[in-house]
Amino acid sequence: MGKTSKVKKTKAGSSTGNVQSLPFNTDKGQHILKNPGVVNAIVEKSALKATDTVLEVGPGTGNLTVKMLEVAKTVIACEIDPRMIAEVKKRVMGTPLQNKLQVNGGDVMKMEWPFFDVCVANLPYQISSPFVQKLLLHRPLPRYAVLMFQKEFADRLVARPGDKDYSRLSVNVQLLAKVEMLMKVKRTEFRPPPKVDSAVVRIAPKNPPPPVNFVEWEGLLRLCFMRKNKTLMAIFRLSNVIEVIEDNFRKVCSFKNKPIPKDLNMKKVIEETLTASGYGESRARKMRVEDFLALLLAFNKADIHFLS
């Protein structure tokens, strides 16, 4: 082995920030990008405009923040760690970039979000799923988001029907947005290095969003992906599934003041609806977003709803 050179501490205003002097809390997902080339690539792929207001989550020591401030109109950085807040402010203090930076302290999942055009973030991995959900339900919709995730999570976001990573998450996100893998990032590009590699994904919300009752949509997908390799007919013949659907059916009929047939056979109604829809022998792992939309419509026409 060759000699290991000593790592020099860098000043807070340098291109990499004062990362050596700050202890990082990896339990909170604090892993700082140390490679300027990767930081520059993320900013380049973000295609920011000079008029953009950018929402950044978890700026850390500000490596990505500073580069975005050089391009965008404003960067609103949301950070929960007071030490990191002080560090990112120090990076731009006394420079022309200072007036372009706004730092919001606190938990980004609990705070009210400001208006922003684009979201660019190296996200704490623990909040990946709830953050994406909040992003896609935020109004007004941003133009897009460029987000760093654990590679395993990113693979699920971009998975297509038939892929091993295709899941309820894939369908939910792809209903509301166009998703694209932009680049992969090795774990060694971070300090301290996480246990797994990462990936950068572009999420562009569909605007306007599809006219879907998301409570029902989520209820349907939850059932379909109970056993994503089984046929839908096999899943919807399960007694506990039939029981839930019949309970919802009775609630809907009561709400509509519609009489419930005395000889109601919910299993038969479900089987006939699935057969007529053409999806009875389909498996969730191979169904497209459009297929689930058509299936939900077929069920709704038969007064079958997914309320819980």
Swiss-Prot record:
<keyword id="KW-0949">S-adenosyl-L-methionine</keyword>
<comment type="function">
    <text>Specifically dimethylates two adjacent adenosines in the loop of a conserved hairpin near the 3'-end of 18S rRNA in the 40S particle. Involved in the pre-rRNA processing steps leading to small-subunit rRNA production independently of its RNA-modifying catalytic activity. Part of the small subunit (SSU) processome, first precursor of the small eukaryotic ribosomal subunit.</text>
</comment>
<dbReference type="GO" id="GO:0032040">
    <property type="term" value="C:small-subunit processome"/>
</dbReference>
<dbReference type="GO" id="GO:0052909">
    <property type="term" value="F:18S rRNA (adenine(1779)-N(6)/adenine(1780)-N(6))-dimethyltransferase activity"/>
</dbReference>
<keyword id="KW-0694">RNA-binding</keyword>
<feature type="binding site">
    <location>
        <position position="33"/>
    </location>
    <ligand>
        <name>S-adenosyl-L-methionine</name>
    </ligand>
</feature>
<dbReference type="InterPro" id="IPR020596">
    <property type="entry name" value="rRNA_Ade_Mease_Trfase_CS"/>
</dbReference>
<keyword id="KW-0489">Methyltransferase</keyword>
<dbReference type="GO" id="GO:0000179">
    <property type="term" value="F:rRNA (adenine-N6,N6-)-dimethyltransferase activity"/>
</dbReference>
<feature type="binding site">
    <location>
        <position position="58"/>
    </location>
    <ligand>
        <name>S-adenosyl-L-methionine</name>
    </ligand>
</feature>
<feature type="binding site">
    <location>
        <position position="122"/>
    </location>
    <ligand>
        <name>S-adenosyl-L-methionine</name>
    </ligand>
</feature>
<feature type="binding site">
    <location>
        <position position="31"/>
    </location>
    <ligand>
        <name>S-adenosyl-L-methionine</name>
    </ligand>
</feature>
<feature type="binding site">
    <location>
        <position position="107"/>
    </location>
    <ligand>
        <name>S-adenosyl-L-methionine</name>
    </ligand>
</feature>
<keyword id="KW-0698">rRNA processing</keyword>
<dbReference type="Pfam" id="PF00398">
    <property type="entry name" value="RrnaAD"/>
</dbReference>
<keyword id="KW-0539">Nucleus</keyword>
<comment type="subunit">
    <text>Part of the small subunit (SSU) processome, composed of more than 70 proteins and the RNA chaperone small nucleolar RNA (snoRNA) U3.</text>
</comment>
<feature type="region of interest" description="Disordered">
    <location>
        <begin position="1"/>
        <end position="24"/>
    </location>
</feature>
<dbReference type="InterPro" id="IPR029063">
    <property type="entry name" value="SAM-dependent_MTases_sf"/>
</dbReference>
<keyword id="KW-0808">Transferase</keyword>
<dbReference type="InterPro" id="IPR020598">
    <property type="entry name" value="rRNA_Ade_methylase_Trfase_N"/>
</dbReference>
<dbReference type="InterPro" id="IPR001737">
    <property type="entry name" value="KsgA/Erm"/>
</dbReference>
<protein>
    <recommendedName>
        <fullName>Probable dimethyladenosine transferase</fullName>
        <ecNumber>2.1.1.183</ecNumber>
    </recommendedName>
</protein>
<feature type="compositionally biased region" description="Polar residues">
    <location>
        <begin position="12"/>
        <end position="24"/>
    </location>
</feature>
<dbReference type="GO" id="GO:0031167">
    <property type="term" value="P:rRNA methylation"/>
</dbReference>
<dbReference type="InterPro" id="IPR011530">
    <property type="entry name" value="rRNA_adenine_dimethylase"/>
</dbReference>
<dbReference type="GO" id="GO:0003723">
    <property type="term" value="F:RNA binding"/>
</dbReference>
<comment type="similarity">
    <text>Belongs to the class I-like SAM-binding methyltransferase superfamily. rRNA adenine N(6)-methyltransferase family.</text>
</comment>
<feature type="binding site">
    <location>
        <position position="79"/>
    </location>
    <ligand>
        <name>S-adenosyl-L-methionine</name>
    </ligand>
</feature>
<dbReference type="GO" id="GO:0005730">
    <property type="term" value="C:nucleolus"/>
</dbReference>
<feature type="compositionally biased region" description="Basic residues">
    <location>
        <begin position="1"/>
        <end position="11"/>
    </location>
</feature>
<dbReference type="GO" id="GO:0042274">
    <property type="term" value="P:ribosomal small subunit biogenesis"/>
</dbReference>
